[in-house]
């Protein structure tokens, strides 16, 4: 069974890891969407979240399971089951911060997997620009929470779509297609 967001957060914090669960999800998603297919994800994760030190053994299994779950949901394009792994906190401001954290780490992972990402044009280039804007997502504490929640919901759906766009672009031939039943 996949570890909960809050349990993973606690384990990462206890181990002194530089990512929270949302940032970890974003980073791993970025690597996968960028087409990384080998085991180099683990050394990259250690390098960027723990000063090149391996994670404690007890943390490697849940992180590996998360990586595999993200990979599975990304490859299920038709089911569109990919989620962003944002905070479980229902506060809209915490959700907005979580989305910004996720997008920042997603771009880092994507850029590591695709070093020439800045040269991309067309819809991929536009999607990168949009994600960079989302990383700068801001709000005022006195913003209308209901309006912010609605806007955030739309942005989250857009980011899910962007992630799938990157995945299908950089992982051609890896997409799971289900047979059409007549």
From Swiss-Prot:
SUPFAM superfamilies: YgfB-like. It comes from the Bacteria. Transmembrane segments: none annotated. Signal peptide: none annotated. One of its GO terms (cellular component) is cytosol. Pfam families: UPF0149. HAMAP family: UPF0149. PANTHER family: UPF0149 PROTEIN YGFB. Belongs to the UPF0149 family. This is UPF0149 protein CGSHiEE_07975. It comes from Haemophilus influenzae (strain PittEE).
């Amino acid at each position: 069974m996949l570890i909960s967001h809050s349990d993973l957060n606690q384990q990462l914090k206890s181990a002194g890891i530089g990512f929270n669960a949302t940032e970890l999800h974003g980073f791993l998603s970025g690597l996968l969407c960028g087409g990384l297919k080998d085991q180099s994800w683990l050394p990259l994760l250690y390098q960027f979240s723990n000063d090149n030190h391996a994670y404690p053994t007890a943390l490697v299994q849940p992180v590996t399971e998360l990586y595999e779950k993200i990979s599975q949901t990304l490859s299920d394009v038709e089911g569109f089951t990919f989620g962003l792994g944002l905070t479980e906190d229902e506060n809209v401001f915490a959700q907005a911060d979580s989305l910004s954290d996720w997008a920042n780490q997603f771009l880092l992972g994507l850029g590591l997997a695709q070093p020439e990402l800045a040269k991309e044009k067309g819809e991929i280039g536009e999607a990168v620009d949009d994600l960079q804007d989302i990383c700068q997502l801001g709000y005022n504490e006195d913003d209308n929470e209901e309006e912010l929640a609605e806007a955030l919901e739309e942005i989250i759906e857009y980011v899910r779509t962007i992630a799938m766009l990157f995945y299908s672009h950089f992982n051609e031939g890896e997409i799971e297609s289900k047979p059409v039943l007549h």
